[in-house]
Amino acid sequence: MQQDKVKIKLSGVSETLLFCLWGRAQLSKKYSSLFYDAKAVELAEKIDYDFSTSEVPFEGIWLNMSRQGNLPPFGLPALRAKKFDDKVKAYINEHPDASVVNIAAGLDTTFYRVDNGSIHWYDLDLPAVIEIRRQLLPEPDRTTYIAESLFDPIWCKDIKRTEDGVFMIAGGVLPFFEESQVKQFFSMLADNFPGGEIIFDAPSKLNDDFRAWGDQFPPEQRDAMRVAMVEAFKDWWEKAPQNQKDKLNNMLASLKTPTKPKGKEWADLEAWWNQLSAKEIGEIWRGFRASSDRYFGRWTLEDANEITKWDSRIAVIDQSPLFKDIPRDPSLSEEIRQFMDYSDKSGRLNIFQLRI
């Protein structure tokens, strides 16, 4: 008997919980030799939700690109999860009874992939997010959900058995805050978890130069990527309700760019996009960057040693490019493999591990 699907309604930031989950599930289905998250696949199939008609225009468009076999932006968290899994497993191999804290957990399912049968796991997120998590993922044994802001030190008191080791993971969260807030966060960790470790990801300043994202590819490949984006955009447009189309049109109208669409119908948008130069596309991306930190973040980090200057109690254990040691599996498209190589070589996206 087929289990009834769970219908949930989300909007805004909370909607991204589902997209990161969807990314892990999709990568698991398409590239299981690289990464497999059985719980994410199970959960994604359990939820009654149409990802292609997101209220957030970028996400609906990008998800359609993923379905067409192009580089999936929401596949990146899955590859990050693979790197985090390896780090968590290495730590609990040395500290089998450790407490592991998943900061800004969302609908993350790391516990199910790394559990050794004796760790205690904590999933920390805002109350509204934890409420959704409890609905979809009830707390398993040795797991505690904490409904608090990551900046509120009160949650630190909920972490028990710290003498057995504390390991924290913060995937895809710190870049969305101001540097002053990130400094406060690390100081709080050093106050409460001396000797603990944390792993997190952050983009470099180079990541802000959106025009350069396509410069590493040959002209023919850049053209193919543009065609794929238009096709994904059109697919989203045909399914999206009018209020979502209006939201995107308003966003485009607010951009300070030399050209704008002449109308609000699909033909107007397609004609506008196809006549844009590479420079204009770069300006458009920078305009989106300026208007929406929700997508592109605020805080960047070039070198983890910068954090040790904030607080002498903090030491660098490791820092490496996001895709380092991830196999360039032949099942991945050439575009994805080239993107991984370029990202690592340029240092755009990195993973950092610190001792507090």
Where are these regions (language model features)?
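A short, conserved alpha-helix within the catalytic core of class I
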Residues: 176-189
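Conserved class I S-adenosyl-L-methionine
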Residues: 199-221, 282-286
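Conserved beta-strand signature within the Rossmann-like core of class I S-adenosyl-L-methionine
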Residues: 192-205, 271, 275
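Rossmann-like AdoMet
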Residues: 1-101, 107-148, 162
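Short alpha-helix
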Residues: 294-324
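Core SAM-dependent methyltransferase catalytic element
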Residues: 332-356
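A conserved beta-strand element that flanks and buttresses the S-adenosyl-L-methionine
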Residues: 168-169
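Short amphipathic alpha-helix with an adjacent loop that forms part of the alpha/beta core around
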Residues: 154-163
